[in-house]
Structures are given as structure tokens and as C-alpha cells.
Amino acid sequence: MKIIAVLGSSGSGKSALAHRIAMEQNCKIFSLDSLSIYKYLDIASAKPTLLEQSQVCYYALNILEPHQKSNVMIFKDLLLQSIEDIKNNSPHTPLLIVGGSSFFLKSIMEGLSPMPPLEEHEEWVKSLGNISMQYAQLTQIDKTYAQSLSPTDTYRICKALALFKATNTPPSIYFATHKKESLGYDIEIFCLECERDELRERIAKRTKAMIQKGIVEEVQNVLEAYGAQAPALNAIGAKECVNFLQGKVATLQQLEEQIFFHTCQLAKRQRTFNRTQFAQITHLKEKALEAQLIQQIHNNIL
């Protein structure tokens, strides 16, 4: 079974490219997007339209309620379910993994240790104070593991502390006795390259379109139903709209500027991650990438 990942910065056009190829080459798409997995935020996530979803089979869309937490294990389980579905029903159909959440893909490919539920211990972690205080606490609990992390790596520090609270075991010992489970499938990784100025222009156009399509009203509906603490509302686009609705952002123009600025920052981080964190990845511009993807799909069929 052929599995190809198409990564790229937010706004680079990877989703449109993948959809076009999936239609032409009879592929299915797994959405590697930390916001599209949520229901009710179609505009904020730039989710495929209902028409597009009728044209191509998409996995990992509209899975979680806005109050639920997303994590890499959920994406791994969904990916395995998608692969099994294809193997059972259309084994020669290629699967395109498409999105900007490259960290999730890297973690899935490197393997994940089985983890207990950690959500109930997050308040305890927060009670320890800011990230510096949390890191100091982790150093006391497990100096070896703490030294393997950056003192500003909020995600891993909080996860390690919650794991200790859940298991009463230092993280280094826990991970040594709970080995990583690999995905078991090869994934060829490509990244859509986009020049900086072109990307900023694309992000600006997309941000303006989101405002015009009603992202504020969409977020307001979720805010009223689930509250400002809903994890889905922490995403770029949604969180700025929450601030606007709470009077912390004065005008729609300022809202648009904030979403644009934060999306550009995200795109820069994504670009750096994609360039540095994968041992094997092919970076190509759109036309070259399209030709290469089609060639890879044809090679699989022959």
C-alpha cells in the first residue's frame, strides 16, 4: 500500500494540490490538521468544503467536539483505522497524508510509547506555576529526563509532569520500560515549498476570505456552546476571534491583522520544522511536486 505525506506551511496550497491529485489519481486523503479534526470550525480550519468531501474520501475530519483535547495518539489511531479501511476495501488506493501538523507525523513515524490518560492531571501541572517552575519541578523528579528537554519545551515538560503524576514513575524509567510502538508502514514525505513573499500574500488573501465567510460568527457559536476554555478555540484564527468577541481586539481590521501575523509566525515555524526534523524529505515547488507525486502514484500501480 502506498502512503505519501504532503506537508507544507499553513497557506502554502498543499491541501488544494493534494485534493486535485486525489481526484485525478483516485487517492484518499488523511487530514493531518490539528483544527480540522474538530467539528463546527469549518472556516477557521480551512476545511475541505462539502463538495470537496463528496469528491474525495477524507479521513480525520470532524472527529472531536470542541471541548475535547486533541493529541498525537488520537491521530495515530485514526491513521491506522484509515489504513485498515483502505486495505480492506480498496487495497490499491494510495493514501495521501496532508496537513501542517508535521510534529504529529514525526512522532507517529518515530513510534509512540503507550500512555495512560493524562488530562485529569493537567490542573496539577498548572498549579506548579510558570514553565520555569514546572521545569524545576521536573528536574527534581527526573534530572536525566529534564536535561534531555529544552527548558522552554512547554508541551513535553507538561506531558512529563502529568505522566509522573499519573504513574508515580519518573518519565525516563517509564519510557525505558514502555518501548515505542512503530507505525509499521513506510511513508514517503514531500514538502510543498513556497517563496516567502508569495506565502505571505496567500496567507493575507486567505485571512481576508475567512473574515468575509464568517469566521467570527462561527467562533461565536462555538464560544457560546463550549466556553472560552475549549481546546479547539486555542488555534490561530479561533483565539483571535475569541479576543475580538470579548472586546480585547477593537476592530475587524485589527482582527484580520492579528490572524495574518500569527499565521505567518506559524508558517515560519512549520517551515523550519519541515526542513530540520525529518531524515528523509523531498522539498519541491508546486509544479515539480505535482509531477513527482503523480509519478510516485503511477509507480505504485505498475
Swiss-Prot record:
Region (Interaction with substrate tRNA): 33-36
Cofactor(s), by name: Mg(2+)
Amino acids binding ATP: G8, S9, S10, G11, S12, G13, K14, S15
Catalytically driven reaction(s): adenosine(37) in tRNA + dimethylallyl diphosphate = N(6)-dimethylallyladenosine(37) in tRNA + diphosphate
Site description Interaction with substrate tRNA, residues in chain: S101
A GO term, aspect molecular function: tRNA dimethylallyltransferase activity
GO BP, sorted A to Z: tRNA modification
Pfam families named in the record: IPPT (PF01715)
Function: Catalyzes the transfer of a dimethylallyl group onto the adenine at position 37 in tRNAs that read codons beginning with uridine, leading to the formation of N6-(dimethylallyl)adenosine (i(6)A).
Record's subunit section: Monomer.
Homology family: Belongs to the IPP transferase family.
NCBIfam families: miaA (TIGR00174)
Record-given protein name: tRNA dimethylallyltransferase
Gene behind this protein: miaA
